[in-house]
Design a protein with these regions (language model features):
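Structured alpha/beta reader/binder surfaces that contact nucleic acids or chromatin modification marks
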Residues: 2-195
Length: 195
């Protein structure tokens, strides 16, 4: 990865359950449309820390194997400290706009099909964005203090203090990542060509 001894401040906010799935190699996929206050989803930085969020996680929006791992929290709740355990390189950004594309991707993400269908239907003029992430774990996770600038319905934040990228290890092998990424990109392309 060639990032030893560099500092990184940029972070992508995502449900804690999704960050866990990415950080343990269970998925390489995130699906985004952007925060409510954003005009759409755009990748601002190709290399980011994964910042876990809790407020909008709902068990019924996840596949059963992930739903049982989520405890809903009250609106506005946030932890006093946040554990940053992984960094992601966003290797591909794939727009999808059809139900068929979404159905083809079902084995590769953690969300319940109804949640994905709802997200696709929200602001239908905007495509759903499939992000493929090459994830690296910190050998020792970094605990940071929560800051109010991290709150709100936005996808991207800058951490108050940058975190060193030293001691990052890939979650899955280069070969396994390449195989998964190729399969997912092919599914999206095949569905585009069917139109």
């Amino acid at each position: 990865m060639g990032l030893v001894n560099q500092q990184l401040q940029h972070a992508l906010k995502e449900w804690a359950i999704a960050v866990d799935a990415l950080s343990t190699g269970k998925t390489i996929v995130l699906l985004r449309k952007g925060g409510i206050r954003e005009a759409g989803f755009q990748v601002q930085q190709p290399l980011v820390w994964l910042y876990p969020t809790y407020e909008h996680q709902k068990p019924h929006l996840l596949k059963p194997e992930y739903a049982s791992k989520v405890t809903p929290v009250k609106s506005g709740w946030h932890p006093q400290t946040v554990i940053i355990k992984s960094c992601a390189e966003i290797t591909q950004v794939l727009p999808v706009s059809s139900k068929e594309q979404i159905e083809a991707l079902q084995p590769y993400h953690i969300w319940h099909e109804q949640m994905i269908s709802d997200r696709l239907g929200w602001q239908p003029q905007r495509p759903l964005i499939v992000l493929l992430l090459r994830v690296y774990r910190l050998a020792i996770p970094k605990t940071i203090l929560y800051d109010s600038s991290y709150g709100g319905c936005k996808s991207w934040i800058d951490l108050i203090e940058p975190i060193s990228q030293d001691n990052l290890n890939p979650v899955i092998s280069d070969d396994e990542y390449a195989i998964q990424a190729q399969k997912i990109a092919a599914l999206v392309s095949a569905k585009f060509n069917d139109k």
